[in-house]
Structures are given as C-alpha cells and as structure tokens.
Curated annotation (Swiss-Prot):
Top-level taxon of the source organism: Bacteria
Protein's organism: Afipia carboxidovorans (strain ATCC 49405 / DSM 1227 / KCTC 32145 / OM5) (Oligotropha carboxidovorans)
Family recorded in the similarity comment: Belongs to the dUTPase family.
Name of the molecule in the record: Deoxyuridine 5'-triphosphate nucleotidohydrolase
HAMAP family: dUTPase_bact
UniProt entry tagged with the keyword ATP-binding: no
Pfam families found in the cross-reference section: dUTPase (PF00692)
Amino acid sequence: MTEPLRIAVTQLPHGQGLPLPAYQTEHAAGLDLLAAVPEDKPLAIAPGERALVPTGLAIALPAGYEAQVRPRSGLAVKHGVTVLNAPGTIDADYRGEIGVPLINHGRETFIIRRGERIAQMVVAPVVQIAFEPVAELPMSARGAGGFGSTGR
C-alpha cells in the first residue's frame, strides 16, 4: 500500500471531541463525515425538508485534488436521506467548514445526533482542461446519441 496523502485538518470549536473522519474498511474509498450538532440539540429533518449539517471540520487540500461529499448508502436505502447536491465538491482552495446539505425523501422525520455518520468524503485528483474550439468534432461510434441511446 502506498503512503497516504497528508491533508491538513482543523477541528472547529463545535467539532472538538469528535473523532476525525476515518475509513471503515481497509479498501474503502470514502471517509465517513460526522455531524457536529450540539449534544443537547439533535437536528430533525422532516419529510421533504433539507438542512445543512455542520461537520466541525475545515481542510486544506493540496493543489490538484478535490474532495467529493457523497451520500451514505445506508441512510439513503433505510431512511431516504441523501446529500442534496451529490456529489458536493470541495475545491483545493476552499478553507471553510465542510457542511453537508441533507434532504429527507423518507416518510418519517429523521433525527441527526452528534457524532452520527452523515456522509462520506472521497479525495481524488483533478485535471483542469482548456477548451479548444473546432468547427467539427471527430466522429465516434456513438455519435450524438443521447439518453438511452445505448440501451435502456
């Protein structure tokens, strides 16, 4: 296994005491993000409602990397709760708190307690591009076939 990429992290005051994000298995792609809501004030998300859940973390990604905030499959399948703008992108030059916009598509109010795993974060390399205007694009086997053009 290669040496892990080192990423600077700051725990904000309301995130103090929570463990840092961690991989749950040896080959996991995403680290679990935890809710940094007050111990005595769980956050309730009613059906059809959304909330920005604080993590109490700020990170400094190295240039050439991004972090994506993605839903946790268990929350989506069991409760209908997912990340609203999935995947959310954290750019390398962002230094603010990581917030997770969750939406409740379920039928019951979903309660988020301090330290609950609410999303996963995947760090990946980024390639920046430069557009090159051309009169015509090269042909491909697919051509301009859009949604559903390769099957169901």
